[in-house]
């Protein structure tokens, strides 16, 4: 932290579908690049260890096990990095598959945050493979170590909340005319179809976006 600020980096690694070892190598490489640039929080895309588009391969035990092996490898090979790191992978828990963000710090796997809102429309069909993490809470064992599913922690004066989600109501947002956006006629109150939904989103503090890990 410098002058009360920390540098947060969002990274998009080059990935290959179902090639967890290659993807982990790219993730590790980018972590060291971001470290050199002073980043203290590093956020990677969901399912970056396996790639998002594995389709029915998500049901293959070999893929799920290799994803965990590479998660441990990422943690071990970045244990000297002074940063909080989030990566995504599929994780089986109690017979169900979850799309989770794993938190890493100094070689430790801190815990997992399962995705809650699963998009299931158009080209998205996550509900075919994954279970919503809305009510899951427990302990996951990887490489004989126990890790908490759902994780909250304070780092000195900084508190982190992690959410992986998509929110269908955002599809109801009004389209904004490019010519008006930011112009003199632009009114941010018109971003929503009605004030009721606007108020609901603020009150519930659920500003979440599809296919994104937030800190």
Question: What is the role of each PLM region?
Answer:
Residues 160, 164-202:
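Long, acidic low-complexity intrinsically disordered regions
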Residues 1-165, 169-174, 203-215:
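Enzyme catalytic cores with a strong preference for nitrogen-chemistry domains
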């Amino acid at each position: 932290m410098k002058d009360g600020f920390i540098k947060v980096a969002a990274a998009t690694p080059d990935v290959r579908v179902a090639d967890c070892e290659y993807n982990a190598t790219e993730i590790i490489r980018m972590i060291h690049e971001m470290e050199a640039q002073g980043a203290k929080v590093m956020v990677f895309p969901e399912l970056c260890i396996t790639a998002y588009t594995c389709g029915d391969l998500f049901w293959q035990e070999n893929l799920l096990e290799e994803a965990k092996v590479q998660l441990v490898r990422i943690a071990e090979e970045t244990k000297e990095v002074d940063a909080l790191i989030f990566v995504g992978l599929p994780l089986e828990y109690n017979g169900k598959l979850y799309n989770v963000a794993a938190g890493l710090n100094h070689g430790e796997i801190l815990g997992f945050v399962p995705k809650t809102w699963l998009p299931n429309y158009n080209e998205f069909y996550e509900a075919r493979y994954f279970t919503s993490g809305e009510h899951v809470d427990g302990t996951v064992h990887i490489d004989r170590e126990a890790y908490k599913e759902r994780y909250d922690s304070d780092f000195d004066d900084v508190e982190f909340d992690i959410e992986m989600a998509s929110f269908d109501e955002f599809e109801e947002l009004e389209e904004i005319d490019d010519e008006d956006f930011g112009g003199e006629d632009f009114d941010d109150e018109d971003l929503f179809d009605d004030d009721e939904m606007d108020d609901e989103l603020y009150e519930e503090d659920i500003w979440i976006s599809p296919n994104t890990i937030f800190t």
